A protein has these predicted regions:
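Short beta->alpha junction loops
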Residues: 37-46
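Signal peptide-proximal N-terminal region
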Residues: 22-35
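Cell-envelope and extracellular/periplasmic
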Residues: 1-9, 71
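Structural beta-sheet core signal
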Residues: 1, 38, 126-128
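Intrinsic-disorder/coil detector with helix-boundary
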Residues: 133, 169-171
C-alpha cells in the first residue's frame, strides 16, 4: 500500500496518506491480511516501491490473494523503450516521492512486467488512485482489467496536477 501527499511541494495532495492508512486498516482489521507493507510519503521512493512490488508477487501460489494500492500522482512520459506498443507513444506512470522524470519513474511497462509474473490461480487486485490510472494496465493480457474512474479534468499546470515533462505536455 502506497500513499504520497508530496507535502511541501507545489503539487501537494491532501488525502493520499489518509487513503493508504484507511486501506491498510480495512484489509488488516476487516479482511485479515497479515503480510502488508505500507509505504507513506518519504518511504515511497522508486526503489522501495519496486522492491515491494517484487516482494508482493514473489512466491505467490494458486489460491493466494494479493493487493496493490497506490494513492498519489500519476502522469505520462514519452515511451522510449518501445513507442510502438502505445497508440499515443506515451507511458503512464505512477509518481514516487523521488520522481525525476527519467530514471526515478515507475511505468506501466514495469507494472505489467511485475504483474505478468503472477501465476494462474492467484487473485491480484490493483487499485491505482491517480491521474492516468485507466491506462496504467492497458496492456494487460492475462488478467481482467476493470477501470472505474471518477474525477475532474484539471489544466496541464496549476492546482494539484503534476505536470508532465515538456515533450509530453506538447502532445496533450
Amino acid at each position: 500500500i502506497v500513499g504520497i501527499n508530496y507535502k511541501g511541494t507545489s503539487s501537494e495532495l491532501k488525502g493520499c496518506i489518509n487513503d493508504a492508512n484507511n486501506m491498510y486498516s480495512l484489509i488488516t482489521n476487516k479482511f485479515g491480511f497479515e503480510d502488508v507493507k505500507l509505504l507513506l510519503e518519504q518511504d515511497a521512493t522508486t526503489d522501495n516501491i519496486k522492491e515491494n512490488l517484487r516482494w508482493l508477487v514473489s512466491g505467490c501460489r494458486p489460491g493466494d490473494t494479493l493487493l496493490f494500492h497506490y494513492s498519489g500522482h500519476g502522469s505520462q512520459i514519452a515511451d522510449t523503450s518501445d513507442p510502438d506498443n502505445e497508440p499515443d507513444k506515451l507511458d503512464e506512470i505512477i509518481c514516487p516521492i523521488d520522481l525525476d522524470w527519467k530514471e526515478k519513474v515507475i511505468t506501466d511497462d514495469y507494472l505489467k512486467w511485475v504483474f505478468d509474473t503472477v501465476r494462474a490461480g492467484v487473485n491480484l487486485t490493483v487499485f491505482l488512485d491517480s491521474c492516468h490510472s485507466g491506462g496504467a494496465l492497458d496492456q494487460a493480457n492475462q488478467y481482467q482489467v476493470v477501470v472505474a474512474t471518477k474525477g475532474v479534468d484539471l489544466p496541464v499546470s496549476g492546482g494539484r496536477y503534476m505536470a508532465p515533462p515538456p515533450d509530453v505536455q506538447a502532445r496533450i
